[in-house]
């Protein structure tokens, strides 16, 4: 985005989009799993954010709100009904995932002690309020 800097907001075909500093770039160290995470037992790894034209906060949908990641179908096929979410960032990826999961009918808990927010201009409290009002269970420990 020419003449733009990180945290500027631009209008995309799907709505407003925050321009984030480069992070989790495919093939980079920042996109790798932590070395202490044993992902060899994982049945599936859902990748998101790989379309350069559409950002992806939620684990369930791209930011266009129509392109699924495949996670809902995967969980539905396994009759999963309850989810506990952790990670980064509480006020963006975790919140968008929690809200989408709630809309899709899951019982959702967010472990706040295992998540960290960006908290740009009150975004963390706004996200916590939105999740709470949507029925997401917010817990510490």
Predicted region positions:
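Active-site alpha/beta core segments
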Residues: 1-82
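Structural recognition of alpha->loop->beta junctions
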Residues: 32-44, 119-141
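Short, well-ordered beta-to-alpha junction loops that form the rim of enzyme active sites
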Residues: 48-49, 87-89
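A short glycine-rich beta-strand->turn/loop micro-motif centered on a GG-aromatic cluster
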Residues: 84-87, 107-119
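Histidine-anchored nucleotide/phosphate-binding helix
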Residues: 92-105
């Amino acid at each position: 985005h020419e003449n733009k800097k990180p945290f500027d907001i631009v209008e995309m075909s799907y709505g407003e989009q925050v321009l984030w500093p480069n992070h989790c770039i495919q093939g980079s160290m920042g996109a790798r799993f932590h070395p202490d995470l044993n992902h060899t037992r994982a049945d599936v790894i859902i990748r998101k954010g790989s379309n350069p034209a559409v950002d992806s906060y939620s684990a369930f949908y791209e930011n266009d709100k129509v392109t699924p990641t495949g996670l809902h179908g995967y969980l539905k096929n396994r009759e999963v009904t309850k989810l506990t979410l952790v990670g980064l960032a509480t006020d963006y990826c975790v919140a968008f995932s929690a809200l989408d999961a709630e809309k899709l009918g899951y019982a959702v808990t967010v472990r706040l002690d295992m998540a960290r927010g960006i908290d740009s201009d009150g975004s963390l409290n706004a996200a916590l309020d939105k999740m709470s009002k949507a029925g997401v269970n917010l817990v510490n420990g």
